[in-house]
Amino acid sequence: MSTTSMQDLLRTLRNRSSIHQDGLEIVDKSIPDVSTPGTLDPRVREVVLTQRPSVSIPEGASPVELARAGMGWDNEDMTTRQISTDVLSIPRPDTTIEARLYRPEAARPLPLVVYFHGGGFFGGTLETVENPCKALADKGNVAVLSVGYRLAPEYPFPTGLEDCHASIDWAVEHADRLGIDPGAIAVAGDSAGGNLATVCCLLDRERPTPYIRYQVLYYPVVNVGEHPNSEYDWTLEAYDRQTEPELLERIILSLQDEEGVLEQWYVQASDSKDPRISPLFATLDDLPEALVITGEFDYLRLEGEAYAKKLARAGVKTRYLQYRGMEHAFLDKLGLYPQAEDSLDEIAKDLKRLFSQTN
């Protein structure tokens, strides 16, 4: 897509409508070049029907290796200035985990966003989210620490969560070295990473003075195991499928089988209704301001909506963005889907407001 075409689509996306409902700001982001309801974004349609990610599958690969190999996408670097990358090691009991720190050339100390990649708790890589993290550092004028937490099934719950939570402590303790402001900490994540981000907020709430001031949850997993609950009932009829209903149904249901995998690989001997696994069942009072982002045709959309509403009812300042025509994991396609870049622009606006930046 040409730069001009992308900029035109981004300008259209910025003209969005919003309503306030029961304390929740709901922002509806229509497809920028399609007006028909219940329609897949044309860029998503092209990817689904004609493109496949290039993957290398080792001979004799296990089910876990096969699942991991199919994740991610070759996205684009959308930065407009130099963003430095430092590869770091965060100490953990008996090991270290890799992290990457992205920083713009700007006056320090900088606010910090700690980012947790998606991948069902068993997959995903720092490489997949590198360009989104760099773009966020550029647009928000912040440092971004992307954390390579340990993955299931080799490391089931709570290892990955503990790695994520410890990475926040480590960043605060090493604020001077990292060039960050320990009083301006945010967390963000996509899918399983959104789960880890908001659960870190739950854990952070127990401190006398919490560190985290803002959370960004891209299409978060908040009800592992799809337990019956009072917040929402999952039904295919909640999705407007006016055009190409069979294709839309296939896209929506593409994650349906993953719930059993999460129980088997991530939860294992734990209880999937534990609020640290399924934060939909947590008490959400006194959590930091939240931005929840979903795609219209994402299997996880309904639980993301429900979580945003529950946050707002608990008194948490919450904004909910729904991108019409989008599939799950659309942030991975930064540079191809204008909605991915627009969502980062929305986050950047919040970061500048919260941390009093004027640039």
At which residue positions do the language-model features occur?
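N-terminal targeting or regulatory segments adjacent to alpha/beta-hydrolase or S9 domains
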Residues: M1-T79, N359
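Alpha/beta-hydrolase superfamily serine-hydrolase fold, recognizing
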Residues: S2-I19, S35-T36, S84-R100, P104-N359
